[in-house]
Amino acid sequence: MKINNNKFLSALAVSILSIGCAVPKTTAVKQAAPLPDQYTQTAGDSISVARLQFRNFFNDKHLVALIDHVLAHNLDTRIAAAQIKIADAYLEARRGALLPSVTAGLRASGTHYGKHTMEGVGNFDTNLSSNIENSQRIPTVITPDYWLGLSASWEIDLWGKLGNLQQAARERFLATRQGKDLLTAALITHTATLYYELIMLDREVAILNENIELQHRALEIVKIHKEVGRATELAVQQFDAQLANTKATLYGVRQEITATENKLLELTGSYTGTVERSTTIDIKAIRYLAEHGHPQQLLQYRPDIRAAYHELQASHADALAARAAFFPTVNLAATAGLQSFNAAQFFNPTSIATQLLGGISAPVFQKKQLKANFNIATAEQEIAFLNYQKTINKAFQEVRTLLSYIDNNEKILAEKHKEVEALGKGIEVSNDLYVTAYATYLEIIAAQKSKITADLDLLKARRDQAHVLIQLYKALGGGAG
């Protein structure tokens, strides 16, 4: 018997080794291309702002309160939280797959065995034996069978298939959490962008109202000049048309304010309400991001990069699990409980019955399917790596572009300030010249149009600077968790 056992084990070992020789090799996880030491040639060493919380980044109390409200009530954040629960449930299921499964059962049956069946002959012969007690005699018409107990089964994870599937689920759970962090950062920046857009629109209304007052006064002056013969009806109509155009623009801006307020209310999950806000766009109210950090910190702080990394690790674990599927599966099973054909003796300790089973199975005619699964998992690992590298490249270039935009927009702001100041003086001069007949009404109209255009351009440049600073905060990983 010992020789037979040795032969069996030897044959089993040879079978496993032969299977192992045919198992494909997995590809190691690739490393992303190294990032440069700095974003620009002029950038120096600095401290990252990625860990700067939005409450410290934005100094506007109304904006901070609005962001808090959005994060607490936005429907997308609640959806993301539910998705995290789903990913956590998948992870728990994978963890449970490594443990034995145990079930409790109760079974009762009755069987009539024919006289020419093995069971029928055996039961008849047993009842004739003098070695059994009366309680052990088997009913022959209907043979009952009662069973109450526990059954257990366990797949032993020798090759790491279940462990790698668990690891894949864990990495995807972490990727889902990063997705929620990415959503949080997006909500913060979107809320702040709309908020500053709203302030800009408020200021635009103020600028238009100021210009309407100026145009009213100019119109009255032209009417007076017409009465004394120094201006024509055409001049009056031109000033009147310009005033009507400015008023129409004002109504359009007010509609934009309503639309922007409604967008913010939508973010908060509200139907109605008001948006409390400051009266001016103050760039100093946003912490300037001169300390934009080292590019390598993107890998640590950007939630989209972290999510892509976890997806890469999950795909590698899937490939390892697909490879492990080529190896034999080892299963253990056991039962323990009470079993008897005599109901009166069912709870007697002598009715305790146990069973222990062990089995091993190896794939033979399934290898095309297994190989296909492995090839798919390997290709998905490559795709995950390329997505990871792509995400890093996109993040780096995004920061470079925003830093360049900030630098150029500062120069734009400086020139726009000069333009507005010059055009403001130009309006005063044109009015004085018109009164003294050294300028025509057309020059006044042109000066007023240029001034209002310059005022709005300066306002939009300030808004753009605020928006790009907000986007840079997000691009560096700020606001994410």
Q: What do the predicted segments below correspond to?
A:
Residues 22-95, 202, 283-313, 363, ...:
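Bacterial Sec-pathway N-terminal export signals of envelope proteins
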Residues 2-9:
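Bacterial N-terminal signal peptides that target proteins for export
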Residues 78, 101-121, 135-142, 153-182, ...:
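Small/polar (Gly/Ser/Thr/Ala-rich) solvent-exposed segments
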Residues 146-152, 294, 354-360:
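Hydrophobic, lipid-facing positions within transmembrane beta-strands of outer-membrane proteins
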